[in-house]
Amino acid sequence: MGGGQLPPAKFVHNQDDRRGLAIESLVSGGCIVSGHVFRSVLFSSVRVHSHATVNWSVVLPGVQVGRHARVTRAVIDRGCTIPDHMVIGEDPVLDAERFYRSESGITLVTREMLERLAQ
């Protein structure tokens, strides 16, 4: 991710059960959205894979959101890879164990936190 200009965001698939879309969101250049994004901000070069959802979240550059993953009320740090089927922001107790959860219910996810989970 150098200083050059990125291509525009791309929304892919046009099938009834699989359609990339963003509603009331800001999506930066270089993003590819195959899942659903709602009231969120995606920084550059974010990939939201098929059947994934990102709701009320801020996703920093270079993040990959895996297939069928669900991210709600979260801040995802730069370069993170959210594994397929992972759920973030829906279970306060589980989120507090795995990540950092603020008093207001926002979950912060970093690469280091995800690496600890993989061990």
List each model region and its residues:
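Left-handed beta-helix
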Residues: M1-Q119
